[in-house]
Amino acid sequence: MRSKHNELKSPIMSCSKRTEWKSILGPLIFRQQMILTQNLNRKLKTIKACMYQIRKLSKLKALYRGL
């Protein structure tokens, strides 16, 4: 029983398991980062468009006040 316990804790096994997890998770994490980046860029474009509309409206408001 003791030898099995030591085998599970061997650094070589944990290292290979770690590499295995990295090879699985690496592409998934990269894909998630790409999706998040695309979503953020989309939201940024929306915010920029809204700010442009606000500037246009405030100019119109200023013109209206001037009349």
UniProtKB/Swiss-Prot annotation:
Q: What is this protein called?
A: Protein C'
| The organism's place on the tree of life at top rank | Viruses
Something else the entry says is: The P gene has two overlapping open reading frames. One encodes the P protein and the other the C'/C proteins.
The upper taxonomy is:
Viruses, Riboviria, Orthornavirae, Negarnaviricota, Haploviricotina
Similarity comment: Belongs to the rhabdoviruses C protein family.
Purpose of the protein: Seems to stimulates transcription by the viral polymerase. May play a role in viral pathogenesis or transmission by insects vectors.
